[in-house]
UniProtKB/Swiss-Prot annotation:
This protein may play a role in the biosynthesis of the prosthetic group of nitrogenase (FeMo cofactor). One of its GO terms (molecular function) is nitrogenase activity. Pathway: Cofactor biosynthesis; Fe-Mo cofactor biosynthesis. Belongs to the NifD/NifK/NifE/NifN family. It holds the Pfam family Oxidored_nitro. One of its GO terms (biological process) is protein-containing complex assembly. CDD domains: Nitrogenase_NifN_1. Gene3D superfamilies: 6.10.250.1090, Nitrogenase molybdenum iron protein domain (3.40.50.1980). The lineage of its organism: Bacteria, Pseudomonadati, Pseudomonadota, Gammaproteobacteria, Pseudomonadales. This is Nitrogenase iron-molybdenum cofactor biosynthesis protein NifN. Keywords: Metal-binding, Nitrogen fixation.
Length: 458
């Protein structure tokens, strides 16, 4: 059982955390023809948009209620009503995500009251689904905001019927963690399809933010993703697969509304995790594991053999959201490596049961201090951790959100046998490249060739 060390500073130095609002927006972006609406100032939305565009290198649709000094004091329900009306009128979305920010939460807004006013004033837009999510910046993190949005999506868009289970016997729901990249989601979908099943990814970023050129020159809404109509059939699936411990609340909500049984997994990193994933698919489908996965498993075993010389007893420092940290720690632990510094931006229930001796809730300065004390040889974190890694004199494996200085990082596949093999190779290569050897000892009495004698000056 890990000891959770809470933040004890009055400020954040080199912040690790990305806000809950951004995480919730990412979940909404996984729905087809959707529009996330930030209830806050224009700067809140502009800041998040910069993060998303630099990470995905794609146009990202976001809107704002544009709170100002007056509405921040006197109330901003009118801003919400007007913003919803404008989006429905001009862009005709299939779904809108209404997300709070630190400003609106501090002001004391009531999303449900504002939403009721909108429904009352504009009955012509009663068929437009709106998902309200409370996501204050001053608590939680990117991952928890994403999880809160997924839970709200389930509670808002999935019908509450428990008599439809198995009506679509080949359909499987998949609740996807914030830390799964579009590449990870493609692997998950392909692995499910290889067993003759149909995946329903909730939400589906593999179709909306996978980095593709759309046929339309401009679209104000998301292109691709999970449609509202498809999401409504989640109660007819035969099973639900939950990837990521952070989605426990969303999984409970989906099971309660639909009665569909679920199976829960961590991140699909490493031999044991992928074995459990494929065996679950084999049990659900009744089909054997395809031969190609047996081959990929043997390749991962060979990769583990090749890299254990470098990774065994390696000292690593990890700064990431809880799901990602636990996934990497399990993979490294399977190779005999040690996590000497573990830092997360916010607490999570799953951290308590982890085998780590301690996990610190903090920032990248905390990571830097713990990594230096533990003599870490490698850092795993997002692009913000680069400066800390350079000061420590160790390499950085970029993972998580955001990755603004690495092209293609947003769509890399980390999951499965092949994804795990590549992670092991990358970690081993970084350690080999930055190997810090011990300078050989030369006795002061050793006789050296004349060419190596010191040049005396007179």
């Amino acid at each position: 059982m890990a000891e959770i060390i809470n933040r004890n500073k009055a400020l954040a130095v080199s912040p690790l955390k990305a806000s809950q609002t951004m995480g919730a927006a990412l979940a909404i972006l996984g729905l087809a023809l959707s529009m996330p609406l930030f209830h806050g100032s224009q700067g809140c939305t502009a800041f998040a948009k910069v993060f998303f565009v630099r990470h995905f290198r794609e146009p990202v649709p976001l809107q704002t209620t544009a709170m100002d000094q007056v509405s921040s004091v006197m109330g901003a329900d009118e801003n919400v009503v007007e913003a919803l009306k404008t989006i429905c009128e001009r862009q005709n979305p299939s779904v809108i995500g209404l997300l709070t920010t630190g400003l609106s939460e501090t002001q004391g807004c009531d999303l449900h009251t504002a939403l009721h006013e909108f429904r009352t004033q504009y009955e012509e837009y009663k068929d437009v689904p709106i998902v309200p999510v409370n996501t204050p910046d001053f608590s939680g993190c990117f991952e928890s905001g994403f999880a809160a949005a997924v839970k709200a999506i389930v509670e808002t868009l999935v019908p509450e019927r428990r008599d439809q289970v198995g009506k679509r016997p080949r359909q499987v729901n998949v609740l996807c963690s914030a830390n799964l990249t579009p590449g990870d989601l493609e692997y998950i979908a392909e692995s499910i399809e290889s067993f003759g099943l149909r995946p329903l990814l909730i939400p589906d970023l593999s179709g909306s933010l996978d980095g593709h050129l759309d046929e339309n020159r401009f679209n104000a809404l998301t292109t691709g993703g999970l449609s509202v109509a498809e999401l409504a059939t989640a109660g007819q699936s035969v099973a639900t697969l939950v990837v990521g411990q952070s989605l426990a609340g969303a999984a409970d909500a989906l099971a309660e509304r639909t009665g569909v049984p679920d199976r829960r997994f961590g991140m699909l990193y490493g031999l044991d995790a992928v074995d459990a994933w494929l065996m679950a698919l084999a049990e659900i489908s009744g089909n054997p594991v395809p031969d190609r996965y047996k081959r990929q498993r043997a390749q991962l075993q060979d990769a583990m053999l090749d890299t254990h010389f470098m990774l065994s007893s390696a000292r690593t420092a990890i700064a990431a959201d809880p799901d990602l940290l636990l996934g990497f720690d399990a993979l490294l632990r399977s190779m005999g490596a040690h996590t000497v510094a573990a830092v997360v931006p916010a607490r999570a229930a799953a951290l308590v049961d982890s085998p780590l001796p301690s996990v610190r809730v903090g920032d990248l300065e905390d990571l830097e201090h713990a990594a230096r004390a533990g003599q870490a040889q490698l850092v795993i974190g997002n692009s913000h951790a680069l400066a800390s890694a350079r000061r420590l004199g160790v390499p950085l494996l970029r993972a998580g959100f955001p990755q603004y200085d690495l092209l293609g990082g947003f769509q890399r596949c980390w999951s499965g046998y092949r994804g795990s093999s590549q992670v092991l190779f990358d970690l081993a290569n970084l350690l080999v490249e930055h190997h810090q050897g011990i300078q050989p000892y030369h006795s002061i009495y050793a006789q050296k060739p004349a060419t190596e004698q010191p040049q005396w000056r007179h």
